[in-house]
């Protein structure tokens, strides 16, 4: 390879990495120190809590934290580099940030043969089933309005980043009803964040 081509590829890689680093900082709210809104604990921005996904950002699109997004990026890039067949899905998306990030990674790498599936009730969390899952006893997460994000709001979040396109597919409903019927042929990456 000639030096000019290598230099051009290095520059492209730097731009790709800077774009994805910026997306990660924006999607977590770290870039603008988005305060927390959880009904427990302090609502001040705490970089340690945000890094580890231990708070509920007030406006950021994901609450999974910087470390989990970095892991999701590494896994998605591995799927691309290793030519793993299949699509990507997250089950339980809140505001859609992790899915937006997966779509951004596909975009940054010019991948057009994979879809990002966005699966959620888009109504919040279901009430706990203590008969089937005794650990649900006392859980009141289904009562928190902060966790109920509509399908239209999630679509708007994709749209705001210029990433709402035909490669983004939505699966609406409670997982026990919606996922068995979802028209997904094959998955390369599955991120489970459902309750």
Where do the language-model regions lie?
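N-terminal pre-P-loop "Q-motif" helix
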Residues: 67-72
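S-adenosylmethionine/decaboxylated-SAM
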Residues: 3-19, 24-66, 77, 82-195
């Amino acid at each position: 390879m000639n030096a000019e081509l290598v230099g051009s590829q290095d520059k492209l890689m730097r731009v790709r990495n800077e774009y994805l680093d910026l997306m990660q900082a924006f999607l977590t709210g770290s870039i603008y120190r988005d305060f927390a809104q959880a009904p427990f604990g302090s609502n001040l921005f705490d970089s340690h809590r945000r890094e580890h996904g231990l708070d509920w950002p007030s406006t950021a699109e994901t609450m999974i934290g910087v470390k989990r997004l970095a892991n999701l990026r590494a896994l998605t890039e591995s799927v691309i580099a290793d030519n793993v067949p299949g699509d990507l899905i997250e089950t339980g998306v809140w505001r859609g940030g992790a899915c937006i990030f997966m779509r951004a990674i596909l975009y940054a790498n010019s991948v057009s043969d994979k879809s990002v599936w966005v699966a959620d009730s888009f109504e919040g969390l279901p009430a706990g089933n203590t008969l089937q899952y005794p650990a649900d006893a006392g859980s009141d997460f289904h009562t928190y309005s902060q966790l109920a994000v509509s399908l239209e709001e999630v679509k708007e979040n994709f749209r705001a980043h210029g990433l709402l396109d035909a490669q983004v597919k939505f699966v609406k409903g409670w997982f026990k009803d919606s996922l068995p019927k979802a028209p997904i042929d094959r998955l390369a990456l599955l991120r489970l964040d459902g309750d």
